[in-house]
Structure formats: C-alpha cells, structure tokens
A protein has these predicted regions:
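A short linear-motif detector with a strong N-terminal bias
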Residues: 3-5, 25-26, 71-72, 78-79
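Conserved helix-turn-beta segment immediately C-terminal to the redox Cys motif
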Residues: 12-32
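Thiol/selenol-based redox catalytic cores and closely related redox-interacting motifs
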Residues: 34-110
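Short, solvent-exposed mixed-charge patches
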Residues: 118-123
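Conserved redox-active cysteine motifs that mediate thiol-disulfide chemistry
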Residues: 1-13
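Short, catalytically relevant binding-site loops at active-site mouths
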Residues: 6, 31-35
Length: 123
C-alpha cells in the first residue's frame, strides 16, 4: 500500500467488506514515489507507531502521520514488492505468487478468487 494512492485509500476504507467476504489483506509498504521520498518517511513512521493499525487508519483518513522511529527498513518492503512483480499500487499478491494489479472491489475480488480457486484446484 501507499498512503498517497487514492485507490489504496478506497481499498482500505472497504477493508471490513473484504473481511466480511472472508478475504484477508496484509499490507506491505510500497512508496510509489520511491525510497527517500516523503511517502517512504511517513510510511516508516506508520510502521514504527505504537499502534500501527490506528496510525495507518489515521493516515488513510487524512489525519496526518505522527513522527515515530524504529529500525524497520521500508526498503525491504519495497524490494520484496518489486521481486514479487509489484510495480504500482494497489496490488495484491496471492498465496501462489500471482499479482493482481490495480483496485478490485470486494465483490469483484471475491468472484475472481472463487474462480481462481476452482481453476487451480481442478474442480
């Protein structure tokens, strides 16, 4: 995710809808503006916050980012994303490594995942 990405905000706002459909989303920091950008610094502060979930919620809701520091290396998040084939946000990586680029609404994603499961399980 990237806190400067409009569709990442939309996805985050709908997280309870994804979860209600049985979809679990785990976040990886992927600052689109690159490493050493303000977005990277802000995302590091979020990941270093005492309450990371609240810090991310606040940032996604436009409440700003409170300074925080720790030893987390956002470059590792970014590099992992690149290695998995992510080149923009939002992007979802399935458990089999398949990358779904772009925003997918909760119902659309559920339908895709159900069909993908059928195709990959042979049923």
């Amino acid at each position: 995710t990237d806190i400067t990405c409009g569709y990442c905000h939309k996805l985050h706002e709908q997280m309870s809808d994804y979860n209600a459909l049985g979809i679990t989303v785990r976040y990886l920091a992927f600052p689109r503006q690159g490493l050493q950008s303000q977005a990277e610094q802000d995302m590091k502060a979020i990941w270093c916050a005492k309450d990371r979930n609240k810090a991310l919620d606040d940032a996604m809701n436009g409440k700003g980012v409170q300074p925080a520091s720790c030893s987390i290396d956002i470059a590792k998040h970014y590099t992992l994303g690149v290695q998995m084939g992510v080149n923009g946000t939002p992007a979802m990586v399935l458990s089999n490594g398949m990358v779904l680029p772009g925003y997918q609404g909760p119902k659309e994603l559920k339908a895709f995942l159900d069909e993908h499961k059928k195709q990959t399980s042979g049923n």
